[in-house]
């Protein structure tokens, strides 16, 4: 049995498109919540550093459900949000055909235990008898984290990264990588990965999206969150990447609630900073201005792709 707090894919896509067009957020149907999770609206990267033998199995499953054959041999395979949606739906249908159940629009609200053992769970759509429960809630289900801690479960602070999205012309990335060969059809879209140690911390780029766009990824009202997304062709004019720094338990006295409060505070400040430009508009400035602390934005050759302005 799989419980998903958000809707099935078709309904979810409509909700995301509605939010993009109007700024009206559905807190349970968005770029974080719904069938496929946050990965549905992403670059669809299949790269990992863990080297587990199950990685090959995952690739085979993706291929069986419609992913492009190139993911089996490319050094940096990716599916793209457009093709990934069909793969996700196909996997879910096979689970159902084999006797599994997927309950959409069903959020976990509580649990019951007896003699230290789990006996059942409470949801927005009823109660389920349950002896084994796997949480795969991502990092945005903060209400679920709070419910678990209120119920007596001990949660630990996991390191996470915080930062912003940087956009630049894809053509300039490729010129810097390929020089005079830039634009040759045999070459893949240019990618990069940067890192720099600053004191005890490391600043680095993450989830670089060649030819992609920046999307509004809020799942709580009054907060701005950004993410990067690419289609399979990666043929957009801009590239984008997250520029982030890691924070961990010691930054929050090993208190998960303080870590969550920190995230919410930053997201609320971003919402307030962009509010004058519209609902869920994001604050922006030129990178050079950011580095110099000037807070200025002059839009030139790079046109921001963030869909809420």
Q: Where are the regions that the model predicts?
A:
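Residues forming the flavin
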Residues: 1-309
């Amino acid at each position: 049995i799989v419980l998903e707090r958000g809707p099935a894919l078709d309904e979810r896509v409509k909700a995301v498109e509605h939010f993009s067009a109007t700024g009206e957020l559905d807190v349970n149907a968005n770029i974080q919540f719904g069938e496929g999770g946050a990965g549905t609206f992403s670059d669809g990267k299949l790269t990992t550093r863990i080297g587990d033998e199950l990685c090959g199995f995952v690739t085979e499953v993706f291929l069986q459900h419609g992913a492009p054959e190139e993911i089996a041999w490319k050094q940096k395979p990716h599916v793209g949000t457009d093709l990934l949606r069909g793969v996700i739906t196909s996997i879910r249908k096979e689970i159902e055909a084999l006797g599994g159940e997927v309950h959409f629009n069903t959020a976990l609200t509580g649990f019951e235990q007896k003699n230290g053992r789990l006996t059942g769970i409470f949801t927005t759509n009823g109660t389920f008898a349950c002896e084994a429960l796997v949480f795969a809630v991502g990092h945005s289900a903060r209400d679920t984290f709070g419910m678990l801690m209120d119920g007596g479960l001990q949660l630990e602070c996991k390191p996470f990264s915080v930062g912003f999205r940087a956009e630049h012309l894809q053509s300039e990335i490729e010129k810097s990588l390929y020089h005079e060969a830039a634009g040759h059809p045999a070459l893949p879209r240019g990618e990069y990965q940067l890192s720099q140690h600053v004191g005890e911390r490391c600043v680095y780029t993450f989830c670089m999206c060649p030819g992609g766009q920046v999307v509004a990824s809020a799942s709580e009202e009054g907060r701005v969150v950004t993410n990067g997304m690419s289609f399979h062709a990666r043929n957009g004019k801009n590239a984008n990447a997250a520029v982030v720094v890691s924070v961990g338990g010691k930054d929050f006295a090993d208190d998960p609630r303080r870590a969550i409060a920190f995230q919410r505070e930053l997201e609320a400040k971003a919402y307030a900073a962009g509010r004058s430009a519209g609902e869920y508009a994001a604050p922006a400035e030129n990178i050079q201005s950011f580095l110099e602390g000037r807070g200025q934005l002059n839009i030139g050759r790079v046109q921001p792709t963030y869909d809420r302005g």
